[in-house]
Regions:
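Terminal, non-globular segments
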Residues: 1-170
Length: 170
C-alpha cells in the first residue's frame, strides 16, 4: 500500500521538476524526460493494475504541464507501458539497471515514433512542431544518464521497511 501512495507523489514531483526546474536550467535539446524513466520502471515492475493507473496519472500530469492536445501523452504513455509489459512476456526483464536503461532508450524511440505518427492521424499536425534528430539524440542520452540514479532510488524505495505489494496484484 505504501508503494501505491508514494509513487503518485514521485510522479507529481518528477513532472513538476521536469516542467518548472529543468526547463529553466537546461537548453531545450538536452532536457531529460523524467516521466519516461518512471513509466519504464512501472512497466518493468510486476505491478499491472496499479502500474496502469499510475501511468494514466503520469499521462494526465504530462498533458497538464506541457499543454499538448488532450489524450496524446496519455495514449503514448499507456502504449509504452503495455509494450514493456508485452516485452516482459517474451524477455526476462530482471533487476539489472543497465537493462532498464536500454528499456528507457527503446521507450524513447517508441515515443518519438508515436509522436511522429499520431498527430497526422489525429489531424493536429498543424499545431505541433516535430524536432529533428539533432534534438532527439542528446535528449535520449541525457534521459538515459539521469535514469541511472533514479533507478537506484526506485530500487532503494522497494527495500524500505513497510513496503508491501498491493493486494490487487497477484
Amino acid at each position: 500500500m505504501f508503494r501505491f501512495l508514494i509513487l503518485p507523489f514521485i510522479a507529481f514531483f518528477l513532472a513538476l521538476i521536469q516542467a518548472a526546474v529543468i526547463s529553466e536550467i537546461m537548453p531545450n535539446f538536452v532536457k531529460p524526460d523524467l516521466m519516461m524513466i518512471l513509466i519504464t520502471y512501472l512497466g518493468a515492475s510486476p505491478l499491472l493494475i496499479t502500474g496502469a493507473i499510475l501511468v494514466f496519472f503520469c499521462g494526465l500530469l504530462q498533458e497538464t504541464f506541457s499543454g499538448s492536445p488532450h489524450g496524446l501523452f496519455l495514449f503514448v504513455y499507456l502504449s509504452i507501458f503495455f509494450f514493456i509489459k508485452l516485452l516482459g512476456k517474451f524477455l526476462i526483464l530482471g533487476e539489472a539497471i543497465t537493462l532498464r536503461i536500454v528499456l528507457v532508450a527503446v521507450s524513447l524511440a517508441l515515443q518519438v515514433f508515436l509522436l511522429v505518427l499520431l498527430p497526422p492521424a489525429l489531424g493536429i499536425l498543424s499545431n505541433l512542431s516535430l524536432p529533428g534528430l539533432d534534438w532527439i539524440l542528446p535528449q535520449a542520452l541525457m534521459t538515459c544518464g539521469v535514469g541511472w540514479p533514479l533507478f537506484l532510488l526506485f530500487k532503494k524505495l522497494e527495500t524500505l521497511p513497510g513496503v508491501e505489494p498491493s493486494p490487487l496484484e497477484p
